[in-house]
Swiss-Prot record:
The active site is at residue 151. This is Alcohol dehydrogenase. Keywords: NAD, Oxidoreductase. InterPro entries: ADH_Drosophila-type, NAD(P)-bd_dom_sf, Sc_DH/Rdtase_CS, SDR_fam. Changing residue 82 to L: In strain: Persimi50. Disulfide bonds: none annotated. Belongs to the short-chain dehydrogenases/reductases (SDR) family. It catalyses: a primary alcohol + NAD(+) = an aldehyde + NADH + H(+); a secondary alcohol + NAD(+) = a ketone + NADH + H(+). NAD(+) binds at residues 10-33. It comes from Drosophila persimilis (Fruit fly). It comes from the Eukaryota. Substrate binds at residue 138. Its EC number is 1.1.1.1.
Length: 254
């Protein structure tokens, strides 16, 4: 899929991986990049505009933990501005297993709620045009970093939820896939808390292993968006992009 003249909404598009991905996206000659983030970063917005002045870049403050009704209200404003949205990227995430409720609220519940809100505009059963959802998971959603089980569990939930969305595409008209970064050198992983402090040095130990840069991750992130494969589970690790084949151990039969 060509991203030329597309309208993209990027939740957490100013974070570590998010900002580098936004830089790559504007190089693709989007029509609009709408960034929703908790913290404003005018310098980053100015930089993105300078990379490609032809792309209209808009920022709205957004906390993914707000009720669905508030997200729906914000999306109504965005749709009024850009008329159509082609791609939604759900990228908000925290890594701190001391904050159990907030980890689940940001990494999973917020993603589900943002998705639920945009379905109000996209669902073909309501006359919507459909759309594409790219959810950011993590390789920990495949195999946990066992010292951070809350974070890992939240990312496993993202993979499962997104796979369900993909299978619902014939009903809703909305396709979905996950991009799942491996350990990427961002502020997220420089220092974080393990669950119940089971491993005080978990961040240091993790960074002793091979990692990738956020730029490497961002380049493959955008490649995955361009490939636009419904139901795909992409692994973005060590500068590579690889589709994951999920092993089915049970079938609901419905």
């Amino acid at each position: 899929m060509s991203l030329t003249n597309k309208n993209v909404v990027f939740v957490a598009g100013l974070g570590g991986i998010g900002l580098d991905t936004s830089r790559e996206l504007v190089k693709r000659n989007l029509k609009n990049l709408v960034i929703l983030d908790r913290i404003d970063n005018p310098a980053a917005i100015a930089e993105l505009k300078a990379i490609n002045p032809k792309v209209t870049i808009t920022f709205y403050p957004y906390d993914v933990t707000v009720p669905v009704a508030e997200t729906t209200k914000l999306l109504k404003t965005i749709f009024a501005q850009v008329k159509t949205i082609d791609v939604l990227i759900n990228g908000a995430g925290i890594l701190d297993d001391h904050q159990i409720e907030r980890t689940i609220a940001v990494n999973y519940t917020g993603l589900v709620n943002t998705t639920t809100a945009i379905l109000d505009f996209w669902d073909k059963r309501k006359g919507g045009p459909g759309g594409i959802i790219c959810n950011i998971g993590s390789v920990t959603g495949f195999n946990a970093i066992y010292q951070v089980p809350v974070y890992s569990g939240s990312k496993a939930a993202v993979v499962n939820f997104t796979s369900s969305l993909a299978k619902l595409a014939p009903i809703t008209g909305v396709t979905a896939y996950t991009v799942n970064p491996g350990i990427t050198r961002t502020t997220l992983v420089h220092k974080f808390n393990s669950w119940l402090d089971v491993e005080p040095r978990v961040a240091e130990k993790l960074l002793e292993h091979p990692t990738q840069t956020s730029q490497q991750c961002a380049e493959n992130f955008v490649k995955a968006i361009e490939l636009n494969k419904n139901g795909a589970i992409w692994k973005l690790d060590l500068g590579t992009l690889e589709p994951i084949t999920w092993t089915q151990h049970w079938d609901s039969g419905i």
